[in-house]
Amino acid sequence: PLGKFGAGFGLIPYTSVGYKLQSFNSDQILQYRYRGEGGLNKVFLGAGYQLSKNLRVGVDASYNFGNIINTNIAFGYNEQGGRLQYQSREINRSDLGGLSYNIGVIYNKLLKPNLEFTASATYSPAAEIKSKNERNFSAIIIDLNTDKEIPVNSIDLDLNAMGLSTTDLKLPSKTSFGFGFGA
């Protein structure tokens, strides 16, 4: 029913963050614990049109969204090597969102009954993704049985005063070309 038009939509993961690292000193005593989670997803809507028998063009628009949370814990010890009651934790959270676009063209021609030539090009203009940022510092107790972090005292850093509450991530423009021969 669409004739020479085509359309598509979808939701796909774009990036993913997931790590848990620990750092020890020369005596193999835990000093730092690092954790990251989250990622960027994209929901997209695309459309294409067949200009001629061998030539098609298309465009898609994407909304990129998600969040990334990075947590760092610094462990303190007394002179006898015992872990202090309170540890320091920093949590950085970035909530992300922004639009991006792609345009493309594809040409194909049947050279022989079992040989087709295909060439394509795409262009993605530069785009910006807004990041709304938060930073929190806490004194925490870590339950030795469950490893659960229990905040005792927390403070949110005023990133607005530093001009960092909202920042921009820049996606560079991208041009790609390709061609191939196949059956």
Feature locations, PLM:
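Outer-membrane beta-barrel porins/channels
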Residues: 2-183
